[in-house]
Design a protein with these regions (language model features):
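Short, well-ordered beta-strand micro-motif
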Residues: 111, 118-120, 198-202
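Binuclear metal-dependent phosphoesterase catalytic core
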Residues: 179-219
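Active-site environment of divalent metal-dependent phosphoester hydrolases
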Residues: 10-14, 40-43, 71-75, 125-126, ...
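Divalent-metal (often Zn2+) His-rich catalytic cores of metallo-beta-lactamase-fold enzymes
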Residues: 117-133
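Active-site neighborhood of phospho(di)ester-bond hydrolases with catalytic His/Asp-centered motifs
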Residues: 6-7, 32-36, 64-69, 119, ...
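A conserved acidic, glycine/proline-rich C-terminal tail/linker
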Residues: 162-189
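Active-site neighborhood of divalent metal-dependent phosphoester bond hydrolases
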Residues: 41-114, 118, 140-146
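N-terminal active-site segment of His-dependent metallophosphoesterases
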Residues: 1-51
Length: 219
């Protein structure tokens, strides 16, 4: 099986569609995990969530939709998905409510066996092998700063731009950041770079790749 992952779309529909074009969900051996922060920032937050709803309806369990901190803010703090004062498009109550209902059903993480953990921000790594018992909702969606180094399971997360001083420390970096041990960070700062990076985990080879139009790059 091949598990694809992307994160931090932030209302950028075109970049999301470009990323989706690299994933063949018609292949029975492929699965897609979306790691949160689909909204706020770009002009198409409704359309992004509606596209995810469409994918989930069509492909069912082949598409896993996880919650990010921006979705959590909508559910827990009443923040609107589209705020005209933030110049994010036009508020639409019907679309807002439909998207909020979908957001309320999102999971916090997805685990493939004991090999890979997908989430938005991270886990409480001080809990070690008991991370599932020791990790709060806050860690899954808001953890900061990002961890690096060896851990008992591979972590795939977004939340922090891979170009940031906490990861690649390179303002021109726009791809997937691998720390050389157990962490794969996939937030490519779409609002700046216009790109949603796509990660792929080959469960047979147990290898990670960055998926691009020109081919896959092993991480």
């Amino acid at each position: 099986m091949k598990i694809f992952a992307m994160s931090d779309i932030h209302g950028c529909l075109d970049a999301f569609l470009d990323a989706l074009s690299l994933v063949d969900l018609e292949d029975k051996n492929n699965k897609l995990v979306l790691c949160g922060d689909y909204i706020h920032g770009g002009f198409d937050s409704y359309a992004v969530v509606e596209k995810i709803i469409e994918l989930k309806k069509k492909y069912k369990s082949k598409v896993v939709v996880l919650m990010g901190n921006h979705e959590h803010w909508v559910i827990e703090q009443g923040m609107p998905i589209v705020d005209e004062y933030r110049d994010e498009g036009e508020y639409d109550e019907k679309r807002e409510n439909k998207c909020i209902y979908f957001i309320s059903q999102m999971e916090l993480y997805y685990k493939y066996k004991n090999e890979v953990l997908f989430c938005h921000a991270g886990v409480d790594e001080e809990a070690g092998e008991y991370w599932e018992q020791g990790t709060s909702d806050y860690h899954y969606i808001e953890k900061f700063p990002p961890d690096k180094g060896p851990f008992c399971i591979n972590i795939v997360a977004g939340h922090v731009s891979t170009a940031s001083p906490y990861l690649a420390n390179n303002s021109k970096f726009r791809g997937i950041y691998y720390d050389g041990c157990s962490h794969y960070y996939i937030d490519g700062n779409v609002l700046k770079n216009g790109v949603v990076p796509v990660l792929m985990y080959d469960t047979d080879a147990k290898k990670f790749y960055e998926v691009m139009e020109r081919g896959n790059k092993e991480l």
